[in-house]
């Protein structure tokens, strides 16, 4: 070890980088809080059967409502069940993709030194 006050190899430049990283991390945390609120308010539509069944979920996959066309009811219980399931999957896939995109936007440019 050298006795030049460098401690654990953490010079002033590294401290500055680390402080900047903490600042960015704090911004990301604040952005994540806003994003969570935004996702809760969002309405994402999943459909099946050409719109016979629609499922609306929030950006974080919370079910909001289901709309079933009278024409879908005439299809019988088994087909209706399949349509609801397909619409739910569609809504889930779309909301997951939306959440992933928003998180990537939020964390882009976040580079932590030494990691």
Swiss-Prot record:
InterPro entries: YbaB-like_sf, YbaB/EbfC
A Pfam entry, by short name: YbaB_DNA_bd
Location relative to the cell: Cytoplasm, Nucleoid
Molecular function GO labels: DNA binding
Primary residence: cytoplasm
Cellular component, GO annotation: bacterial nucleoid; cytosol
Superkingdom classification of source: Bacteria
Keywords of this entry: Cytoplasm, DNA-binding
Family, as annotated: Belongs to the YbaB/EbfC family.
Function: Binds to DNA and alters its conformation. May be involved in regulation of gene expression, nucleoid organization and DNA protection.
HAMAP family given in the database record: DNA_YbaB_EbfC
Assembly behavior: Homodimer.
Name of the protein in question: Nucleoid-associated protein Ava_2322
Native source species: Trichormus variabilis (strain ATCC 29413 / PCC 7937)
